[in-house]
Every structure is written in structure tokens, then in C-alpha cells.
Amino acid sequence: MARCPSELFDDIADVLAEVRAWPGIVEKGPGVFYLRRRPFLHFHLAAGGARRADIKGRAGWIPFDLPRPVSATRRRAFLRELRIRCRER
């Protein structure tokens, strides 16, 4: 599965800006985030153009579908999931 190009992050720019400000988070490349030197979040573009985030949890990678454009409800759910997984680690 291909990495998602950065130009497809425009509708989640506010979420990514918040994540960048969290302690211990480093953006190694566009849309590739590490938490304390370990992979935490990256994005894929599936066949047909479906966008998906992979969030690293305690038990492994958790897929999170992010349709474009993302709804406000889905954006809040994504941010909530990121906060939960960040606290786990």
C-alpha cells in the first residue's frame, strides 16, 4: 500500500498541527510521526484513493479510515484515538 501524499492532508491540517505540538512527537517526513524515537503515526493511500492512518498502539498498528473530505465527527474521533494511543506509550 502506497504512502499518502502530503497534499491530501489539507482537511486534517488542524489535527496534524496539534499532534506536532505534543511533547515527544517528531515529524520525520510529511505525515510520518514518531513518539520518543518510535513510529507512532503514518498514512496510506489504498487502491481507489481511500486514505487510511496507521496509529501505533501498545499491541501493534491500528488502522483508522479517514475518508476525504473528513467529517467533523470523524476528525474528532481521529484526534481522540491519537490521544488515547499516545498516552498508552
Regions found by a protein language model. Give the residues of each.
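Charge-dense, helix-prone N-terminal extensions
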Residues: M1-R89
